[in-house]
A protein has these predicted regions:
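C-terminal terminal-subdomain/extension
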Residues: 62-141
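Compact nucleic-acid interaction/catalytic patches
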Residues: 17-73
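Short, basic/aromatic recognition patches
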Residues: 14
Length: 141
């Protein structure tokens, strides 16, 4: 059973490009049941990614939608030591009965709050208008 703030590894899922992805980490940001267009889910998560090297880290952290992972804010076992980031602009909706996953760690409340705030800011500025367009351009370009 996963809950808010847990870091999980999902055995397999379909990525935003529609391709199957194996063994990937996520942080749970909502653990309440709901439906989207007739499809049920019972938790929402953001994908976590590792940095390949310093150049990759610099490139990925230029995007304001990527939140760096502060390793001292994560507690658990089976963690890699690469360092990484969370994609705050991608939400994945899962049904626990339809996927295999395991909880490997949890995120402290401070980092989780920072992630939730970033998601809310991104959501607020996703609408149309010149300010939203400027922010979107800054975030995604």
């Amino acid at each position: 059973m996963c809950k808010l703030g847990d870091i999980i590894v999902v055995k397999e899922y379909f990525g935003s490009d529609g391709k199957k992805v194996n063994q990937h980490s996520f942080v749970v940001i909502n653990d309440e049941k709901d439906m989207i267009e007739g499809l049920s889910y019972d938790f929402v998560a953001n994908v976590m990614l590792s940095f390949h090297d310093k150049k990759h880290k610099t490139k990925k952290l230029k995007y304001k939608s990527n939140l760096p992972i502060k390793e001292e804010k994560i507690t658990g076992k089976d963690l890699n030591d690469k360092g990484g980031y969370i994609r705050a602009d991608e939400l994945y909706y899962f049904n626990k009965e339809k996927i295999e996953y395991k909880v490997i760690a949890y995120m402290d409340h401070e980092l989780l709050d920072e992630l939730i705030q970033l998601i809310l800011i991104l959501h607020e500025f996703r609408d149309t208008g010149p300010v939203a367009k400027e922010l979107r351009d800054e975030i995604w370009n």
